[in-house]
Amino acid sequence: MENSHPHHHHQQPPPQPGPSGERRNHHWRSYKLMIDPALKKGHHKLYRYDGQHFSLAMSSNRPVEIVEDPRVVGIWTKNKELELSVPKFKIDEFYVGPVPPKQVTFAKLNDNVRENFLRDMCKKYGEVEEVEILYNPKTKKHLGIAKVVFATVRGAKEAVQHLHSTSVMGNIIHVELDTKGETRMRFYELLVTGRYTPQTLPVGELDAISPIVSETLQLSDALKRLKDGSLSAGCGSGSSSVTPNSGGTPFSQDTAYSSCRLDTPNSYGQGTPITPRLGTPFSQDSSYSSRQPTPSYLFSQDPTATFKARRHESKFTDAYNRRHEHHYVHNSAVAGATAPFRGSSDLSFGTVGSSGTPFKAQSQDATTFAHTPPPAQTATASGFKSAFSPYQTPAPPFPPPPEEPTATAAFGSRDSGEFRRAPAPPPLPPAEPPAKEKPGTPPGPPPPDSNSMELGGRPTFGWSPEPCDSPGTPTLESSPAGPEKPHDSLDSRIEMLLKEQRTKLPFLREQDSDTEIQMEGSPISSSSSQLSPLSHFGTNSQPGFRGPSPPSSRPSSTGLEDISPTPLPDSDEDEDLGLGLGPRPPPEPGPPDPMGLLGQTAEVDLDLAGDRTPTSERMDEGQQSSGEDMEISDDEMPSAPITSADCPKPMVVTPGAGAVAAPNVLAPNLPLPPPPGFPPLPPPPPPPPPQPGFPMPPPLPPPPPPPPPAHPAVTVPPPPLPAPPGVPPPPILPPLPPFPPGLFPVMQVDMSHVLGGQWGGMPMSFQMQTQMLSRLMTGQGACPYPPFMAAAAAAASAGLQFVNLPPYRSPFSLSNSGPGRGQHWPPLPKFDPSVPPPGYIPRQEDPHKATVDGVLLVVLKELKAIMKRDLNRKMVEVVAFRAFDEWWDKKERMAKASLTPVKSGEHKDEDRPKPKDRIASCLLESWGKGEGLGYEGLGLGIGLRGAIRLPSFKVKRKEPPDTASSGDQKRLRPSTSVDEEDEESERERDRDIADAPCELTKRDPKSVGVRRRPGRPLELDSGGEEDEKESLSASSSSSASSSSGSSTTSPSSSASDKEEEDRESTEEEEEEEEEEAEEEEEEGPRSRISSPSSSSSSDKDDEDDNEADSDGQIDSDIDDQGAPLSEASEKDNGDSEEEETESITTSKAPAESSSSSSESSGSSEFESSSESESSSSSSEDEEEMTVPGVEEEEEEEEEEEKETAMAAATVVAMAEESMPPAGGQDFEQDRAEVPLGPRGPMRESLGTEEEVDIEAEDEVPEMQAPELEEPPLPMGARKLEGSPEPPEEPGPNTQGDMLLSPELPARETEEAQLPSPPEHGPESDLDMEPEPPPMLSLPLQPPLPPPRLLRPPSPPPEPETPEPPKPPVPLEPPPEDHPPRTPGLCGSLAKSQSTETVPATPGGEPPLSGSSSGLSLSSPQVPGSPFSYPSPSPGLSSGGLPRTPGRDFSFTPTFPEPSGPLLLPVCPLPTGRRDERTGPLASPVLLETGLPLPLPLPLPLPLALPVPVLRAQPRPPPQLPPLLPATLAPCPTPIKRKPGRPRRSPPSMLSLDGPLVRPPPGPALGRDLLLLPGQPPAPIFPSAHDPRAVTLDFRNTGIPAPPPPLPPQPPPPPPPPPVESTKLPFKELDNQWPSEAIPPGPRRDEVTEEYVDLAKVRGPWRRPPKKRHEDLVAPSASPEPSPPQPLFRPRSEFEEMTILYDIWNGGIDEEDIRFLCVTYERLLQQDNGMDWLNDTLWVYHPSTSLSSAKKKKREDGIREHVTGCARSEGFYTIDKKDKLRYLNSSRASTDEPPMDTQGMSIPAQPHASTRAGSERRSEQRRLLSSFTGSCDSDLLKFNQLKFRKKKLKFCKSHIHDWGLFAMEPIAADEMVIEYVGQNIRQVIADMREKRYEDEGIGSSYMFRVDHDTIIDATKCGNFARFINHSCNPNCYAKVITVESQKKIVIYSKQHINVNEEITYDYKFPIEDVKIPCLCGSENCRGTLN
């Protein structure tokens, strides 16, 4: 211490130390204060210096001898071990060598997952070194991404294997090996940039991307590729900037990824929202391009991608991007042959690249091929397949052969990555085979480059997994994401696809939409969309390759495929795949090669233009469209469809044939456009991209030159492209583009529309779609443009044909093309296999790919904008035109109204317009459902119309019941979009009728006479039937007239009609019009034959009416305008004819004809589509509603409505006929109004249907004797003649199935011929033909005679010459002339011949009409075959179109002798009539036996026209179900038909035979027939209303519904007095008589006599309706009594299709299945050359019928809202009838419950004491609280009073039981007593109340304190509970708060004397159930509540 430094010691001041001298002398070095006085008191300071000397000499202090360290040494003796951790080797960007895959990236983690949780989760798989969860640096939000570094590679791999795609905290997590964390960083960037959310992260694609070892590598590769110009932009894995498309996207890297890792679409493929389209909505295409930057890639992809951007993009991007090779392959594929590649490639894949490994080898071959046109094709096909294949491992291997980037890349990469995407590359392959390496060696280097790119860039990782391509999923993952990641990526992608596919609907970026979804869904999504097709396609098309992928793909596909609107595009590509399937093997070498070359060249060009993308996309979309419905078909068809990208839908439509024939189609289609266009394509590549981008948009037309390339790729663009591919196609194609993409795709409309509405919910089976397409296409007739047809036929007679047909339709319904690939244009192949693309130069264009991509993006954007604009415009037009039509109709109605007092029709007509609005809304709704604005959203051309119409199917079903409910028709059919609207309007009409039944009844005759028949009153036999007909006419009159007019001027008028139709049913109408135009030519002769005397237009109209009514009407209409118009025309014309018959009397035939024509023109627009939709729905509704007047009595509510609808339709039709001079439409309106009138009465007499029938008929006749009288005839005639259609419709149902097709067709033919007599033509046809035609149809011979019988009796033109017309009936040749016209359609079915009607259906009509579908059924007249009736209808026979199995056939007819049994449907005369006429023949068999019925019925048919049978049927509805099974079988067939166009054509039927209208719906007629079987139908006959109802119901409901439709039959019978007979002309009489079902007495053989009798009995016949009750009682009543057998208007093809495919919505019952099977077998026997039939294999399936008969849906009391949404509707007024019905029951229940459950919630309800105490108390509490006396005073009083209790006692009270009495005087305002009890909550109080009630405690002692608490004094409390109520109490209760507790205190209100009872006012709330008050006070209220 002393040594311590001086500073330690105070520097000793020398003075202090010892002696001063010493101190001074010694220079101490240190000193220490030894003693401090401050510490030791009493001492002096003592210093020690240098340890030796002290300042004070003191002996006690010794100097320090040894200086040592004073510190304790022990501390330093311990040794601490120091562990220096060995520094770990860090693997960073500078790390050299293979990085051990120990790092695992987690994505999509629940944001609740934290490090500890993740560590615990991972450590079970191995030691975890590091766990890091990434958060957003700004928001610190959990990004769902985590990094886990394992100590061992095994642990990491196991963790990935076990944790990937597992659910953690509710999230399916994505786990992948991320060696360098690149994927994680990508995810991080995507999330931080805000492009994706943790759950939308495109892990699949990113996975594919991440697998690539280093992004840098990828970038460099991408850059290299870019430099090379291969697909660097599109393929460069790392060239984010390189990718042109990428450039647009924020995540250029994504693009780079796309480029780098084409496998992983990354942002696009990944579905990353941002990158999805790389900027443009079609960015997807762009991104597509970017992924496959080379134009070729783009082009190849463009068609699909652009168009199907979403799907293709997704698929392609995912699959493609994932597969590096895909990238370059994409280009290759694209360049090689977008479609061809697809087809070829698919083939190649299937053949060569069956397995992943083979792919590699093959890929080279493919690549080589790709270079050559065939290889290119192969590559393309391969590529396309790849698009699908992404899930199939083959793709990755394919990339290895980058040498042939086109083939290989397209093949492998595309197959692996994405079938669709692969095709894109082919174009590039030529110039730059490898997408990755653009120049390299085009042949050799490209593959390596591409491989190297894929392997090197991303392929390195991707390629190592490439071998996995066989798995598909693994391949994708491995290929794209690298060894580890690829698998996860694929799975993730697939998962994403499945999950997000649907979510992301980049509607406009078709592919993008799909892609986006798929992107998110990962390539699989895109793949899946294609894969879905591939799935089946893979199986067929690419056995090995595809096979694996399809399953995987399918799921994703499903998700994506579901995008119905885009399906077409998807379908295109998928179709390519699908077609490829068939063609893959064949097309690859031949057609594919040329296609490949063309495709490649063109694709390259187009690729540049984005065509490739469109192709892929479109194909995707097309496939989607088709694929969604029938994935298999798509897959099969893809190879060809790719060629006819535009055709995809069509192809899809005929998947079956398409699949097999698709290849051909592809080749043929493709060749057409590609040969000319492909070479030129390169120049227009940029434009094509727009087209590809938006194949659908009409804007594409400019790009057509580029489109040729796109053509293969882009279906829609191909429309323009067609010119190059096929000169003929161009015309078609160009038109197609003009049509709004989603607006006019007839084919699409047919499939998408018919199926569209229901599509989403009801994927169509391949067979189903094939059938439907076949039918529709057949109905459409050969494609308007032979080129496509030729190509299609050449390519695939069946599949392609249909595909082509749609394209033909497409021109009219560009919407096909528009919405998505939309062109049903197989004709516009995506590439022409026959025309090799101009070298693979497009590939060489790779260098420009970025530019091309950029251009494509712009073009795509423009195309999207155009498409959107067009769609919007189209929608607006549709709405506007509809509004205009509505306005026109209103004006017409007003005019008619001025002519006729009856205004019900007006209302109804107005209502119908409403349907149009509804249609518009439906369109929008459909569009919305369509998943976006894109073509997909539009339904691809079916688009608006299709989408709108689909709902109508449902609505119609519902309508019959609604009609029954007086004014609830609207409600009844809440779900039908368009049809529903129509039906709604009809319902409203019916409602109007119901509202003014008497008025109408009184007024109707006049109004009918005035309005319907200016000269003659209504032709309507029965107010009901004719009314219904007129109602239908109103709805269908316009449409029908329009159709008629259109028919007349089909060529010239067709356009306008079409325009209007388009407005209404853009696509469907167009197709129909086309078909009508074709059929019109046929019909023209018919018309001339029918009504030679009439003016051309008038003639046609009249004849059409006749024909339409009986048979020709539908035919004519169909010819003229298509199903909808045809339907309208039929109704109108049919009515017109009948009216003319009356009119003839009043010399109004000409005018009427003219009017009909004019009406046709005017109404056509509005009504045509409305008719198709509305008419089918409205007509049917109206028929049923109008007929209800007659038959409603039977089925008061539903049937009544149906009848009313039918009657209204009939009346409307007649009014239109009679009022033609005034204005067809006005007349039509009149008709509608008139029907209302009759309907009104009918409805009025709902209770007494019989009365109503008679009354309606009588009234109508009185006011419009002629009309009414004729109405009976019309009913008969109409039903018979027009009914023939209806009968045929029944045929479709029961009769129609047997008779419908054959008999009706025959009848229709006959009628068509019959019209040949100018005078007789119209009405004669209707009258006579109806009956005979059915007979004629089924048993050609027997039917002919019956027709004669029928015809002579009722000559339409001249009342006096009914017979001549009848004889003409046998001359059904005209119908025969119209192959499109399916017998059912033209004849009674209007649907069977719906072929023509079908035209209304976008794609279905032609097929149906053509021959096979519906027609075949009726056309082939096989004596023993159910479809022998087809023979009766040569048109059908000749049509040779594939017919839907159940569509036209009269199931039983085959079994029954064609001559007799087939007539069965016609036989459905009213029971009475049947008995009267053919009772013995038809009635017994038909009525009594369900199945036999058809056989017997045909026989009776001759005698008893369908109308009579149907009439009889009305009652049968109840029987129907029993009979239905046998007879109903046909119904199912009809049901099939329903889908086709039953709704539309039926309107004609409706108008013709209002009552019959319902039966037409297929089962309905069958039901009627079934009813007929029960000869009892006599009683049933009165139930004619029932028939109508049955018919309606039948139509609405499969078989159950028919019973309600039956009622419509009776309406005609309503004609009341003979006076009518007198008034009505002879012709009218004839009509009426047949309408009456030819009295039982007359047989078909006796028809002539009967006709004479009818003439005599016409009045009686009217009365027969009256006698309906009698008829019911005595079915065999005289002919007069028998109500005219309502003939149900044949359903339009569209309606048939709707009904047919309605099974997707309502399921199919055993009966339908049975009849379908029968029909199928018969069709097989007949072999009418229906291609689809050969592709169809009957496989048993349990019935899926969800609901039984919807007989009286209304009866449940719950009314369905028309819109299907109660919120949007508000509420409907309730009919008194309904109200009484439920009020009584509810009252009973209400009263009873209180009795039974006194203690329930209202213990005191029965008696005051039982009243719910809680309520009472609550009320009292409220009151008490309201007495807000000062709390202080209350509390004070309470406290004061509490001390002084009042003396009270309880004794028996005179008021009630016990009471509380005062034992001492109580002053006013004093506390008497506190209400004491248990303080309980409301819930407990309620429980106790119930318990007390159960225990028998009647009184309630619960007093509510406040809202929450109640005091229960029931079992514990004080005397206060005994206080009784008094209306003049002496106390009051008050709630006061004491110490925060609420208490109920009873205060005296006044002075209370001793022994005075304490009372207070319970103040119960006012309630319905009153509790009597027993207080007896002077001012007693009498009740406590």
Curated annotation (Swiss-Prot):
Residues 393-404, 423-433, 440-449, 583-594, 670-710, 1331-1373, 1600-1619, 1678-1687 have a biased composition (Pro residues). Residues 1-25, 234-304, 353-710, 955-1480, 1519-1624, 1658-1687, 1786-1819 are annotated as: Disordered. GO terms for biological process: methylation. It is an enzyme of class 2 (transferase). Residues 242-258, 264-273, 281-304, 353-365 have a biased composition (Polar residues). Residues 92-180 form the RRM domain. SMART domains: N-SET, PostSET, RRM, SET. A motif (RxxxRR motif) lies at residues 1817-1822. It is found in: Nucleus; Nucleus speckle; Chromosome; Cytoplasm. CDD domains: RRM_Set1B, SET_SETD1. S-adenosyl-L-methionine binds at residue 1962. Disruption phenotype: Mutant embryos show growth retardation from 7.5 dpc and die before 11.5 dpc. Residues 67-97 are annotated as: Interaction with WDR82. It catalyses: L-lysyl(4)-[histone H3] + S-adenosyl-L-methionine = N(6)-methyl-L-lysyl(4)-[histone H3] + S-adenosyl-L-homocysteine + H(+); N(6)-methyl-L-lysyl(4)-[histone H3] + S-adenosyl-L-methionine = N(6),N(6)-dimethyl-L-lysyl(4)-[histone H3] + S-adenosyl-L-homocysteine + H(+); N(6),N(6)-dimethyl-L-lysyl(4)-[histone H3] + S-adenosyl-L-methionine = N(6),N(6),N(6)-trimethyl-L-lysyl(4)-[histone H3] + S-adenosyl-L-homocysteine + H(+). Histone methyltransferase that catalyzes methyl group transfer from S-adenosyl-L-methionine to the epsilon-amino group of 'Lys-4' of histone H3 (H3K4) via a non-processive mechanism. Part of chromatin remodeling machinery, forms H3K4me1, H3K4me2 and H3K4me3 methylation marks at active chromatin sites where transcription and DNA repair take place. Plays an essential role in regulating the transcriptional programming of multipotent hematopoietic progenitor cells and lymphoid lineage specification during hematopoiesis. This is Histone-lysine N-methyltransferase SETD1B. It comes from Mus musculus.
